[in-house]
Amino acid sequence: MSSTHVVQHLLAASALTVAFAATAAAADPFMLTSTTFKDGQMMPRKVANTNPQNPNCVGENVSPQLSWSNAPEGTKSFALLMEDPEGRGGAGVHHWVAYGIPASVTSFAEGEVSKPSEKYIGGKSTQGVGNYSGPCTPPGTPHHYTFVVVATDLDPKELAPGLTREEFLAKLVPPAPAMSHSKGTAGLVGLFVKPN
């Protein structure tokens, strides 16, 4: 999959940047970064999932370190979404859905969200869990894992746990004429494939 197609899929499938309210103007852009991997580069093996029943799960399920900065004005909470748009034959796999992250929280340490935490409300991933669930990429071409942080004007405790990605997005963008609760988004992409 070309990098152009990945970016287009991320924007279209996530419906975050285009469909939500424009990011509030700021001197510095809203940013998402990681010390575990560089944007557009391979992620280390340890971030892959561990499942003895799936030979493609070859890691330790250690969540990557994530930091975000320069949140838009009016932000009350954050959400983090992780998706593999190439997973399940192009149908996509939602590896992590987390929301209700207080505005005072601007990072997660490496491994911190591999388990439930009081710092976020766990949604429901494709795997049916609320915490980070790492890649189980088959051999061949690396998959592009998209990480998106969403700044919202929602109170951190406003949403119930267990929302799927689609349910969360529906809460974020209610039917017109109601305004979107998104204040802006930032993202990065990590690559992974099962080593030979």
Regions picked out by a protein language model, each given a short descriptive name:
Residues L10-A21:
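Bacterial N-terminal signal peptides
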Residues M1-A12:
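Bacterial N-terminal signal peptides that target proteins for export
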Residues A25-N196:
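N-terminus-centered regions that define maturation/targeting leaders and the start
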